[in-house]
């Protein structure tokens, strides 16, 4: 199978090899050293500021989103949620579940956030802003710099979910004044799913220390204290953390975060150029490098997903909900190159010849 899904993605041979090894015991100095290296690489790649920290949670990225909501906010806050798809809605749902007042800035599916729309909420008493910098369900990439300026002007605590955009699109945490960055192991980190990463600015570290959170597993202050010695409070996904270490070193060896972003960008541009004459419309007004969301003009999107899987050995990523039959997504993350794009192109051309596209 050729994997154009958005996670898990195709792993490099080096990362796969680590997954085939026996999982070692982890309460050791050697594992602590590896975890501290993981933290330093992450802080370097997201361009975090002085005093920033990172922790690694054994959970899906939604678990990290929930941990941030629980540990950084309370019923005394008033949050603005950028809600342009299913993952923006997830932030809104988490706020509701934890009884934290929140207002959704709703965007039409696939539309970018403009400064005019954002500044309708200027000076309205908000204390925090939550955004999926890349909205995975639509492929839209929001302007993090514009959002950061808005947060500075209004003194908002700024939370950035970069689960699929980290390492695929440019992001400098300190430059955009983000207080929290969230990402996951199965996107551009190109490792198996199961580990989420939370990066804290110095301000966020202090905020978490003061927050009373009624949770043991999702207590981020406890996570931060343990990570000081390169450990976790509970048994982590040891094998995946070893694979993350291998992958982070792989990125460094290949020229660092800038080169990785360029590589993903080339992959996205190559795909979009190759399919420009096929009967699709592009969904996103401001597309991320990480994925291309496609609307088939004459075919059922979910049927195409099934045909590609069953007859061509190709995975793309179907949408759910109202977009199930109208949109599917093609990922550009992981160990893919132009040759894989060409294979997908030929499959789509064949479907067109068969009258199925």
Regions picked out by a protein language model, each given a short descriptive name:
Residues 112-167:
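Active-site phosphate-binding strand-loop segment of PLP-dependent enzymes
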């Amino acid at each position: 199978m050729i994997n154009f899904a958005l996670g898990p993605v195709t792993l490099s041979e080096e990362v796969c090899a680590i997954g085939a090894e026996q999982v070692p015991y982890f309460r050791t100095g050697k594992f602590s050293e590896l975890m501290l290296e993981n933290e330093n690489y992450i802080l370097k790649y997201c361009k975090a500021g002085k005093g920033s920290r990172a922790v690694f949670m054994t959970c899906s990225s939604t678990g990290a989103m929930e941990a941030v909501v629980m540990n950084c906010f309370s019923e005394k806050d008033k949050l603005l949620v950028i809600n342009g798809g299913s993952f923006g809605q997830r932030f809104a749902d988490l706020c509701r579940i934890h009884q934290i007042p929140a207002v959704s800035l709703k965007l039409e599916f696939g539309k970018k956030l403009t400064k005019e729309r954002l500044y309708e909420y200027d000076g309205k008493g908000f204390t925090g802003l939550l955004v999926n910098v890349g909205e995975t369900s639509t492929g839209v990439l929001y302007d993090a710099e514009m959002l950061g300026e808005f947060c500075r002007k209004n003194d908002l605590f700024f939370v950035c979910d970069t689960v699929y955009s980290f390492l695929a699109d440019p992001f400098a945490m300190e430059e955009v004044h983000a207080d929290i960055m969230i990402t996951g192991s199965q996107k551009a980190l190109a490792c198996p799913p199961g580990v989420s990463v939370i990066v804290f600015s110095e301000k966020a570290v202090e905020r978490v220390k003061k927050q009373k959170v009624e949770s043991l597993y999702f207590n981020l202050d406890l996570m931060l204290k343990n990570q000081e010695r390169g450990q976790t409070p509970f048994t982590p996904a040891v094998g995946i953390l070893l694979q993350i270490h291998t992958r982070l070193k792989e990125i460094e060896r290949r020229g660092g975060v800038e080169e990785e972003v360029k590589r993903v960008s080339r992959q996205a541009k190559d795909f979009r150029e190759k399919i420009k004459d096929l009967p699709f419309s592009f969904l996103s007004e401001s597309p991320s490098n990480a994925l291309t969301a496609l609307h088939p003009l004459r075919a059922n999107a979910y049927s195409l997903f099934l045909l590609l899987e069953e007859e061509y050995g190709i995975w793309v990523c179907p949408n759910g909900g109202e977009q199930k039959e109208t949109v599917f997504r093609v990922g550009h993350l992981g160990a893919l190159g132009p040759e894989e794009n060409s294979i997908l192109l030929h499959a789509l051309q064949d479907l067109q010849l068969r009258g199925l596209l």
